[in-house]
């Protein structure tokens, strides 16, 4: 049988494989970047001009390097576990949402389902030290299904979406219209427990004047995430 024969050597591919291994080792030894927005800008530069297939591979490699070099990763919910495995590998530790948030307070990062029955994201209004700094999937055409929560947050990267919560009893359509009149593009993401979550186009700071008369008595920005 042909499979009993030793496969031919390919010195060129072997050299490329060794170069990849050496580059990954060197990158891990260098440690994580000091800021999440710096990491996002670097990844975006690497993805510039990449083909769709290349983009998936580069994001997966980048995510695994970040997971290995950065804080421990917690996952909460089935979708979060799937998305975390795709981006960061299988090292995420599963916990309920509230326990995941407590782990973030102690220095971890947590990827938490948006589809949770309880609006854990609303609790971030009362816990400003915790911030959404990423959302997966993170391409502009996809709706976020899970949020990466950290203590550090993310600054503007030039292509972002911001997450805003309100307790307004208005319909989502009416809220979107009101936000549009204020100069903000809002997209409803979730509603539970009397709270509504919206994605705002761009990087919107908590003190942005356009939010001054936003609908609702209890409102606030709970983070922002880059788009690739």
Tell me what each language-model feature is.
Residues 1-228:
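Domain-level signature for soluble enzymes in the chorismate/prephenate branch of the shikimate pathway
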């Amino acid at each position: 049988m042909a499979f009993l024969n030793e496969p031919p050597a390919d010195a060129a591919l072997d050299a490329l494989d060794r170069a990849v291994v050496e580059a990954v080792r060197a990158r891990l030894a260098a440690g994580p970047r000091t800021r999440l927005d710096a990491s996002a800008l670097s990844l975006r530069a690497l993805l510039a001009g990449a083909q769709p297939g290349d983009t998936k591979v580069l994001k997966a490699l980048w995510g695994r390097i970040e997971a290995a070099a950065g804080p421990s990763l917690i996952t909460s919910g089935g979708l979060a576990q799937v998305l975390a495995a795709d981006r960061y590998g299988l090292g995420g530790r599963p916990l309920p949402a509230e326990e995941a948030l407590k782990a973030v307070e102690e220095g971890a990062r947590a990827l938490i389902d948006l589809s949770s029955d309880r609006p854990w994201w609303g609790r971030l209004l009362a816990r400003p030290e915790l911030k959404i700094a990423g959302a997966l999937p993170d391409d502009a055409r996809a709706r976020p299904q899970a949020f990466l929560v950290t203590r550090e947050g993310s600054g503007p990267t030039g292509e972002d979406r911001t997450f805003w919560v309100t307790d307004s009893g208005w319909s989502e359509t009416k809220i979107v219209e009101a936000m549009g009149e204020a100069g903000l593009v809002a997209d409803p993401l979730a509603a539970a427990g009397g709270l509504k979550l919206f994605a705002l186009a761009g990087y919107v700071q908590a003190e942005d004047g356009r939010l001054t008369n936003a609908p609702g008595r209890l409102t606030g920005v709970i983070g922002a995430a880059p788009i690739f």
